[in-house]
Regions:
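Acidic, glycine/proline-rich Ca2+-coordinating loop motifs
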Residues: 1-388
């Protein structure tokens, strides 16, 4: 996801509820009970974008769980974008990563997507770049070995996201990688190597600024389908390179501002069960042509046994699509109170309050805070059907 620091103002969301108490953490917005939250107002200001980012944990604060960075000791020597960055938006994306036990030894391995070189790099410069995607094999002793070249997943480009899934039901995890202007599907041969089957599968003909990827069997036919997030319709214009454009209340470099460009559509690839896919995003109603999408997650949010879809969008409203069980979806974002308008980046789904239904956690752009949406379906005995 985007990782540069511009001057976006801190933005907050306030949700007021009639019969519940709202507990506001320093960087979280919690959706609770009964009454629809107040709308989000872009442009709410704080002192500046980073003035509170380096706050230390208060002395004596209990730390039940602590993490230590062991990347170097573990052999994860990855460095994102080993090149000189310009003010072009595709160069400003962070590294996507995905865990998956591709060799079936019971230990998860790690794939990291990378921007190998600047957009202006020549083919020779790109080939000579030390950057590029990486696959780290888990050695089962706390360390990893870089097996990128030997495995055949050493593509060099401007890559953003990745996701593992067994798309052909052969018992081995395959890998999809999203890039600027490219979608790659790697088939797992079962011997530690992968084959690029993007053309054979029908994925290589789609050009766009592709970011997040999420696998899910939305039609429950036993074959996992693929959702791809599109960011913006980016086009470099040298005449605008030195200019600025508005982002919320701020003026930022034009070519670095996602608000300068119209949203890219999202793609839904239906798995045909024979190693190929058919793109049905518009037909299914999930192409989200108004969202600058960075992440998506499949989950059965309403408990009907069918996977629904949540999409996290940057500088555009997030979307929640309800599965209608007929290959189509209904946009219930507003009725479900989850269509917030911020710089949504990371997305995770889980039952944080252990009440039996999945909740949504979203990370946002610098100093915009995080959001935790609590699913009301089983909250205090209330069954909330957002479709009604």
């Amino acid at each position: 996801m985007p990782n540069h620091v511009s001057r976006r103002r801190q933005l907050t969301v306030r949700y007021t509820l009639a019969s519940a108490l709202l507990l506001a953490a320093a960087s979280a917005a919690v959706l609770a009970l009964r009454r629809k939250p107040k709308p989000y107002v872009p442009g709410q200001e704080n002192k500046d974008i980073t003035h509170e980012l380096d706050r230390a944990v208060p002395a004596g604060y209990p730390a039940a769980v602590q993490f230590t960075n062991v990347a170097e000791q573990a052999g994860i020597n990855f460095r994102h974008f080993q090149g000189k960055r310009s003010t072009q938006l595709p160069e400003d994306m962070g590294s996507g990563a995905a865990w998956g036990d591709y060799d079936g030894d019971g230990y998860p391995d790690l794939f990291i997507a990378d921007i190998a070189a600047p957009m202006t790099a020549s083919p020779a410069e790109l080939a000579a770049s030390p950057g590029g995607n990486r696959l780290y094999h888990n050695n089962r002793n706390g360390t990893f070995t870089d097996v990128t070249a030997a495995s055949g997943v050493d593509y060099k480009g401007l890559c953003n996201g990745a996701a593992w899934a067994d798309y052909d039901n052969d018992g081995k995890l395959d890998l999809v990688v999203t890039c600027y202007d490219h979608i790659i599907l790697y088939h797992n041969r079962g011997d530690g190597t992968f084959e690029d089957v993007s053309h054979k599968a029908g994925l290589d003909g789609f050009r766009g600024f592709w970011t997040g990827a999420s696998w899910g069997d939305y039609d429950r036919d036993g074959n996992v389908d693929l959702y791809i997030c599109g960011y913006v319709k980016y086009k470099y214009d040298a005449t605008l390179a030195g200019k600025t454009s508005r982002q919320f209340t701020e003026m930022v470099p034009y070519m670095l501002n996602p608000s300068s460009f119209p949203p890219e559509r999202n793609l839904l690839f239906h798995n045909n069960g024979n190693g190929t896919f058919t793109e049905v995003g518009k037909k299914a109603g999930v192409d989200d042509t108004t969202g600058r999408s960075l992440n998506a997650a499949w989950c059965d949010f309403d408990g009907d046994g069918w996977p629904d879809l949540y999409v996290a969008n940057d500088i555009s409203e997030n979307k929640l699509y309800l599965n209608l069980h007929n290959g189509r979806f209904k946009d219930i974002s507003e009725k479900a109170w989850v269509n917030e308008y911020r710089g949504s980046m990371g997305l995770a789904v889980g039952d944080w309050d252990r009440d039996g239904d999945p909740d949504i956690f979203i990370t946002h752009w610098v100093a915009q805070g995080y959001a935790l949406f609590s699913n009301l379906r089983y909250n205090r005995g209330i069954t909330a059907d957002p479709a009604n």
